[in-house]
């Protein structure tokens, strides 16, 4: 979709929401998890790899704040960091994800060590962080608008996983429940920023491209997991059965 005449704020929001057709809820890996067709290893692999994304989110949000000169925006945006890191003695989303890891049979060290993070996942997530560091703060902030589609994916896990995977402990689902309300709040703020900033056809086209970039990141993460856990073709599988890839955060 190429915008030639500046869309109204409502029409621009509709164009952003239409990108939901490419959200990773439609990826075969996620469909398999939703339908109960994923193996224990595939669930564990997803949880371990997605943790790298979760721990990068506060770094991304801090980069946005560092580039943002507007105090009012920073005061609102900082809540996203607190949601993940925790505040006032309360645990945040990262701790909740560690509990999800334990609920699916992984140790905290399995996640914190990052030894299970596939190179393709790491590259995709690092690209997102580097974009947030280098882009203008408005564009970086609006790259988070995949949150438009997040409540649906969190609810789908709450609806289907307990039924299909009774071996997952109940306490593991807290993260998904907490994000239902948090994501809706974040969407409201993000949409307001996008509609205020994108006041020309050029900016609207670029923002749609940025949103597609973020969708590409989420989809590529699942492509990497598909190769490793569904097709049994992890990196270097033709030369070794060991995990030979790098396991440290280099950027």
Curated annotation (Swiss-Prot):
Gene3D superfamilies found in the cross-reference section: Heme oxygenase-like (1.20.910.10)
Single annotated GO MF: pyrroloquinoline-quinone synthase activity
Pathway note: Cofactor biosynthesis; pyrroloquinoline quinone biosynthesis
GO biological process, one term: sulfur compound metabolic process
SUPFAM superfamilies xrefs: Heme oxygenase-like (SSF48613)
E.C. code: 1.3.3.11
Top-level EC class: oxidoreductase
Entry keyword set: Oxidoreductase, PQQ biosynthesis
InterPro entries reported in the protein's UniProt record: Haem_Oase-like_multi-hlx, PqqC, PqqC-like, Thiaminase-2/PQQC
Reactions performed catalytically: 6-(2-amino-2-carboxyethyl)-7,8-dioxo-1,2,3,4,7,8-hexahydroquinoline-2,4-dicarboxylate + 3 O2 = pyrroloquinoline quinone + 2 H2O2 + 2 H2O + H(+)
Similarity-based family: Belongs to the PqqC family.
PANTHER family xref list: 4-AMINOBENZOATE SYNTHASE (PTHR40279:SF3), PQQC-LIKE PROTEIN (PTHR40279)
NCBIfam families (alphabetical): PQQ_syn_pqqC (TIGR02111)
Assembly and binders: Homodimer.
HAMAP family: PQQ_syn_PqqC (MF_00654)
Role according to the record: Ring cyclization and eight-electron oxidation of 3a-(2-amino-2-carboxyethyl)-4,5-dioxo-4,5,6,7,8,9-hexahydroquinoline-7,9-dicarboxylic-acid to PQQ.
Protein name listed in UniProt: Pyrroloquinoline-quinone synthase
Gene this protein is translated from: pqqC
């Amino acid at each position: 979709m190429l915008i030639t005449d500046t869309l109204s704020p409502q029409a621009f929001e509709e164009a952003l929401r239409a990108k939901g057709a490419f959200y990773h809820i439609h990826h075969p890996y996620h469909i398999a998890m939703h339908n109960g067709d994923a193996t224990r290893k595939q669930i564990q692999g997803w949880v371990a790899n997605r943790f790298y994304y979760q721990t990068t989110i506060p770094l991304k949000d801090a980069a946005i704040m560092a580039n943002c000169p507007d105090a009012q925006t920073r005061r609102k945006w900082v809540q996203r960091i607190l949601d993940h890191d925790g505040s006032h003695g309360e645990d945040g989303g990262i701790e909740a994800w560690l509990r999800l890891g334990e609920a699916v049979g992984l140790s905290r060290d399995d996640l914190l060590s990052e030894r299970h993070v596939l190179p393709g996942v790491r590259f995709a997530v690092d690209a997102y962080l580097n974009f947030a560091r280098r882009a203008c703060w408005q564009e970086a902030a609006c790259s988070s608008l995949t949150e438009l589609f997040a409540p649906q994916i969190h609810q789908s896990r709450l609806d289907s996983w307990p039924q299909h995977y009774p071996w997952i402990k109940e306490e593991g689902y807290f993260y998904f429940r907490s994000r239902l309300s948090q994501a809706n709040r974040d969407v409201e703020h993000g949409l307001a920023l996008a509609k205020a900033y994108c006041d020309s056809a050029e900016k609207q086209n670029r923002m749609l491209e940025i949103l597609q970039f973020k969708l590409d990141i989420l989809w590529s993460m699942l492509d990497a997991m598909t190769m490793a856990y569904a097709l049994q073709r992890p990196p270097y599988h033709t030369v070794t059965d060991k995990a030979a890839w790098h396991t440290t955060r280099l950027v």
